[in-house]
Amino acid sequence: MSRLQNDTFLRALLRQPTDYTPLWMMRQAGRYLPEYCETRRRAGSFLDLCKSPALACEVTLQPLARYDLDAAILFSDILTVPDAMGLGLYFAEGEGPRFERPLRDEWEIRNLVAPDPHAELQYVMDAVAEIRRALGGSVPLIGFSGSPWTLACYMVEGGSSDDYRRIKTMAYTRPDLLHHVLRVTADSVVAYLNAQIESGAQAVMVFDSWGGVLSEAAYREFSLPYLERVVAGLIRERDGERIPSIVFTKGGGLWLESIAAIGCDAVGLDWTMDIGRARALVGDKVALQGNLDPAILFAPPETIATEAKRVLDAFGPHPGHVFNLGHGISQFTPPEAVSVLVDTVHQHSRKLRGGR
């Protein structure tokens, strides 16, 4: 593998000094880019796009061709793992992801087993390897997975949900069943992320997208311990290089200090928490990633620049900040807005550190 030409992102995750604040965006390869939409059209379906290593590589690289981003992230979907468990993932027009066989009966739950990522998910590993080769050492590649709780939400609900009625009912009436789902899913996530690392991922991120729908007590029972189980099982070093881990709970500001204590290298923040206050709470224990409101990218260029500087100034010129949005970029974002954001973050963060 080629030696990294730009390791700013990895050094920031490890809280090492950097000349500027590195930046990447959740969903940076996505529908706001016309070239992505063209590749998606050629693929035929979203799942076909995910399952083609060549096309997944193509769309992963598209935002890097447009913008001076400091990391690439594997193009895939968090629901590949439950799909590999046999739940039958499909995408209904206008409804988003659905499962043909959601977990509703106890016998289905007791029969749930972790898939072999080198068998059922080999197409993801092939994509990781192909992307690493195509990057040629330009920037690091991030692998990712959904969190056990977030995956379980989809697996039990059968798709997206407004009220999480089925999984919360299970949590409060049959917690033993839910814990079984979470244990199997956590072990699946560990194996999946480690396989990505073995295939070439240089950092990994766990998306706990629905952790914020839980109460304080429920989060500490059904999400946090399984995030800790995942982090504890990850490969920490490969080929003499550290493999940093990022954990992101959307709506998880309440539990920031607890998340920072599970052993991950960085904690992702959504836009609802001041990043300066977050840094004061966690100190130098972990790096922080975030946390611009994605909706700011609909604003005029001067507003985008002002708000990006606000985030950078709040964190300050300290090591350990990766700039990102507080959630995924909207499909309606004007591509030129991202150019303003990237240029502002790189230029202003250099000035904060006394550079030009």
Swiss-Prot record:
Superkingdom field: Bacteria
The protein's matches in Gene3D superfamilies, at most eight in alphabetical order, are given as:
3.20.20.210
Q: Could you tell me what reaction this enzyme catalyses?
A: uroporphyrinogen III + 4 H(+) = coproporphyrinogen III + 4 CO2
One Pfam family here:
URO-D
**Which of this chain's residues are annotated to bind substrate?**
27-31, 77, 154, 209, 327
Site positions per UniProt: Transition state stabilizer: 77
Q: InterPro entries, per this entry? A: UROD/MetE-like_sf, Uroporphyrinogen_deCO2ase_HemE, Uroporphyrinogen_deCOase
Q: Does the keyword Transferase apply?
A: no
Tell where it localizes.
Cytoplasm
Q: Which CDD domains match?
A: URO-D (cd00717)
Q: Which BP terms in the Gene Ontology apply to this protein?
A: protoporphyrinogen IX biosynthetic process from glutamate
Gene Ontology MF, one: uroporphyrinogen decarboxylase activity
Protein's pathway = Porphyrin-containing compound metabolism; protoporphyrin-IX biosynthesis; coproporphyrinogen-III from 5-aminolevulinate: step 4/4
List the GO terms this entry assigns under cellular component, sorted alphabetically: cytosol
Q: What is its main location?
A: cytoplasm
Tell me its family: Belongs to the uroporphyrinogen decarboxylase family.
What exactly does this protein do?
A: Catalyzes the decarboxylation of four acetate groups of uroporphyrinogen-III to yield coproporphyrinogen-III.
Looking up HAMAP family in the UniProt record yields:
URO_D
Q: What is this protein called?
A: Uroporphyrinogen decarboxylase
Q: What is the lineage of its organism?
A: Bacteria, Pseudomonadati, Pseudomonadota, Betaproteobacteria, Rhodocyclales
Please state the gene responsible for encoding this protein. hemE
